[in-house]
Structure formats: C-alpha cells, structure tokens
Amino acid sequence: MIKQIIISDSNKKSLKIKSFLIKNFKKKPIFNSNLVIVIGGDGFMLKTLKKNKNSSKFFYGINSGNYGFLMNKFSPKHTIKNFSKAKMITIFPLEMIVKNKQGLIKKSIAINEVSILRQSKQAASLSIQNGAKIIIKKLISDGVLVSTPAGSTAYNLSVHGPILSLNSKKLSISPISPFRPRRWKGKIISDKSIIKIKNLNPKKRPISAVADNLEFRNAKDIIIKTNKKIKFNLLYDSNRSLQKKIKIEQIRKETT
C-alpha cells in the first residue's frame, strides 16, 4: 500500500504540523496514493503545483503562512477527518510565452496571474490585443495584469481588478496605475482568448514579464493564454471551499 505524500515548507510551524500528521497517520493511516498534502503558504503551494504540473494527483493545502487563500485552515481536531470529506475543484493555469529584446523565447505557467511590470523609472508603454482584435492601442502605466479566476482575489484585487467566480470561464486584464488613458479600467475576456502584449518602446522603457513569482526581464512580446492541457485538482474543506472564499471577497469589495 502507498501512503499519502506530505510536502511541507521548512519553517517551524509547517514542520510542527507535518510531525502532527505523521504521528496521527501512524494511528489511523489514509491509504491514498493520489493525495498530496501541502503545508505552507500560498507561495509554497504555487511552487509545489508547478513542480507537479504533469501530475494527476489531488492537492490538499494546509496553511502555515500568512493569508493562505489557496489553503485550508489547520485544526488538530478536524483536519484528519476533513481529508475524506474535502470537495475538489479543478483549475487551469495561464501559459506565458515571452520574447525578449535579444530574440530569446522563454515559457512558463502562471496559476494566479501574469504581471507585466515596468523595469525602470520610466512607465511602460504597451499595446494589448485579443487575437487580432486591439483592446488598447497604447497604454502608459506601471504595467498590466492578466489574472485567472483563482488569482483574481490576489494581486489583481489590489490593483482594483474585478473578482471572477471560478466557473466564469473568464480572464481579467487590469492596468497598474494607468497614466494614459487614465480612465481605462481594464477588460474581462473569455478564457479562450489569446492575449498579445507588445512593448512599444523596449529600448527606453524596459519591462519584465512575471508568471506568479518567476520573472523574465527585458520582455518585448508576450503571449498569454489558458493552458487546458494542464490542470490542478485542489481539495478544500466543505465548509470553507475556494468558491466560498472568493464569494466572501466579492461581498467585501462591494461593501467597501
């Protein structure tokens, strides 16, 4: 029999939770070769998912970080019991293809968002397209975000982007501190879209392209699309699902 896999961050809180689980699994083991328990914060979960992007396993996150939006709350009394009752959701990442000023092409996936950020004191000068359709001919700003529904309550929300429900089949494009045009609020588009972002002045106004926390500098042309060939199966406690967390954030946004 193959027992579940436990992956934890290296901080004291994570290791303490891991030790607790191992001790209790010896008393009452869960024989499930498809279950991966991830102990840490959101950043650690994103890192773990990317390392296992070709896996068909189910990931149950336990928060030992700060906010832990993608994680479940740890409870000595209830966590062990919650594994068998957890609800699954499936999310698809973004795929980012970056061509830099030297013509080199790099690729990465992003679970939360792709961030296009100015790389110097100069604001970024960008054009944004959805396929062949121009969304905005010239955006002068600190950058722009392309966010998934799962990531719409993270960095995207901080730049006043819209919160997307998990079943919306949408992506959000949100400007960061737009200077021209000042009133452009971004756009919600289909998750089938192919987004093309071009640096209009790469020599004077360099930009970085960041997939979650992986940065590629001196980007010139960026293509962003949903990768339906990669999927992540996440498990959540039935009383605190990811859908419910997103709904709570929507209500908070509407009432503030």
Where are these regions (language model features)?
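ATP/NTP phosphate-donor binding region
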Residues: M1-L35, I39, F44-S55, F74-T90, ...
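Solvent-exposed alpha-helices and their adjacent loops that cap or buttress functional pockets
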Residues: K28-F31, M88, S108, R118-K121, ...
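Short hydrophobic core segments
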Residues: V36, V114, V144-T148
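Short, acidic/small-residue loops that bind anionic groups at enzyme active sites
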Residues: S55-M71
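Catalytic core of DAGKc-family lipid kinases
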Residues: Y67-G143
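ATP/nucleoside-binding phosphotransfer catalytic cores, i.e., glycine-rich phosphate-binding loops
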Residues: S108, I116, K133-I135, W184-T256
